[in-house]
């Protein structure tokens, strides 16, 4: 039994499968007699107090502001590694996925805004379809195994990473609330300490965790979204130590399984529970639901593919050897899997009063529809365009 579990966890698609499973459990709980237990569990208050400092939040907020900050540490580590030695480490490597990612942020936001042009109460959700869920998208890609060209995997990974950078900028600029000067000063001091540790090539991960915890608490109290602390921590961990150690890689390997198999499934379970009670066709076709769903399915596909295509045709970028535009189109569809990142942005966009709670449900429904169709359609398109030549020849006879 243990051996079977180990084999499953080693699969490229394991994290995506686990995310989907926990999301389905959330939908099951939210639409059965267990729904009161589910929602009461998420609203259960949890508090931490150290001297005069205290944080009092419902469990759902601890998941979204606390555990997700750990996930953003991993994002920061991955982005830094890829920028320094990986898929986006120089202009030639970065420009093609960067342009695709730019289209994948601009066009979905435009699609959402156009659909919600006459619904001002929904317009603050414009950023929801901008994000790509790295774990889910790579999980679907992993289902096809070695038949997917390595260059295509790198393109998707680099694009999703740049996409996340864009989401981080959006969170920092548009989703910060009233700012606390004292907390910001505390956060600035913590950042300064992290930078000094980086310059001194401190390799003790526990030191970054302690200072990072202070930074997270300060950012949380400051009014800036706490997950940004995670990104800063990730960027401050050095790639190399004084004696050749690799603290960044070590920290990344330490966090990756926890994020993939604990934090993200927990986030999915906490946020994917959409009650369908009282929903009708008018709910399904509400501007908010349709804006999010079509932003992910249509906006992402058109944005990523059209910008990538034009970049090559205009001579700005080059297609990597071994991949073609059919495969780029299929991957563009996969980029419409927003799921966890889109759920996260929905919580930030509509995180206020009771009406906003109803808006979150509509947005989540759109995310589930758009991400689900993108995953299935993207998988079959990619399967078709990576099919061995012998199969294609047989089909053409």
From Swiss-Prot:
One of its GO terms (cellular component) is plasma membrane. The keyword Repeat does not apply. The chain crosses the membrane at residues 14-34, 36-56, 59-79, 95-115, 125-145, 154-174, 177-197, 204-224, 254-274, 292-312, 328-348, 365-385. It is a multi-pass membrane protein. Keywords: Antiport, Cell inner membrane, Cell membrane, Ion transport, Membrane, Sodium, Sodium transport, Transmembrane, Transmembrane helix, Transport. It holds the Pfam family Na_H_antiport_1. It is found in: Cell inner membrane. GO terms for biological process: regulation of pH. Coiled coil: none annotated. The keyword Transmembrane helix applies. One of its GO terms (molecular function) is sodium:proton antiporter activity. It catalyses: Na(+)(in) + 2 H(+)(out) = Na(+)(out) + 2 H(+)(in). Belongs to the NhaA Na(+)/H(+) (TC 2.A.33) antiporter family. Na(+)/H(+) antiporter that extrudes sodium in exchange for external protons. This is Na(+)/H(+) antiporter NhaA.
């Amino acid at each position: 039994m243990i051996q079977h579990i180990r084999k499953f966890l080693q699969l490229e698609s394991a994290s995506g499968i686990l995310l989907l499973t926990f999301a389905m459990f959330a939908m099951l709980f939210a639409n059965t007699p267990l729904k009161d237990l589910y929602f009461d569990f998420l609203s259960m208050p949890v508090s931490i107090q150290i001297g005069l400092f205290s944080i009092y939040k419902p469990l759902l907020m601890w998941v979204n502001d606390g555990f997700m900050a750990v996930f953003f540490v991993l994002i920061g580590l991955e982005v830094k590694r890829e920028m320094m030695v990986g898929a986006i480490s120089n202009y030639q490597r970065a420009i093609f996925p960067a342009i695709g990612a730019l289209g994948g942020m601009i066009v979905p936001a435009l699609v959402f805004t156009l659909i919600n042009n006459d619904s001002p109460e929904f317009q603050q959700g414009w950023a929801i379809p901008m994000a790509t869920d790295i774990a889910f998208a790579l999980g679907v890609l992993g289902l096809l195994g070695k038949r997917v060209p390595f260059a295509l995997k790198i393109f998707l990974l680099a694009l999703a990473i740049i996409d996340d950078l864009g989401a981080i900028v959006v969170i920092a600029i548009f989703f910060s609330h009233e700012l606390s000067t004292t907390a910001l000063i505390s956060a600035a001091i913590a950042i300064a300490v992290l930078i000094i540790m980086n310059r001194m090539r401190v390799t003790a991960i526990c030191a970054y965790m302690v200072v990072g915890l202070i930074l997270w608490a300060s950012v949380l109290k400051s009014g800036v979204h706490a997950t940004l602390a995670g990104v800063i921590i990730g960027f401050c961990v050095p790639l190399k130590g004084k004696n050749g150690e690799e603290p960044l890689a070590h920290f990344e390997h330490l966090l990756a399984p926890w994020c993939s198999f604990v934090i993200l499934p927990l986030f999915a379970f906490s946020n994917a529970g959409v009650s369908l009670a009282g929903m009708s066709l008018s709910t399904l076709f509400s501007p908010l639901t349709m804006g999010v769903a079509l932003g992910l399915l249509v906006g992402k596909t058109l944005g990523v593919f059209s910008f990538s295509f034009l970049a090559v045709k205009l001579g700005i970028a080059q297609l990597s050897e071994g991949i073609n535009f059919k495969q780029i189109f299929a991957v563009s569809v996969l980029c419409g899997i927003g799921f966890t990142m889109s759920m996260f942005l929905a919580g930030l966009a509509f995180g206020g009063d009771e009406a906003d709670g109803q808006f979150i449900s509509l947005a989540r429904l759109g995310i589930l529809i758009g991400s689900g169709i993108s995953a299935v359609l993207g998988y079959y398109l990619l399967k078709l365009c990576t099919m061995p030549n012998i199969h294609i020849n047989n089909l053409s006879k």
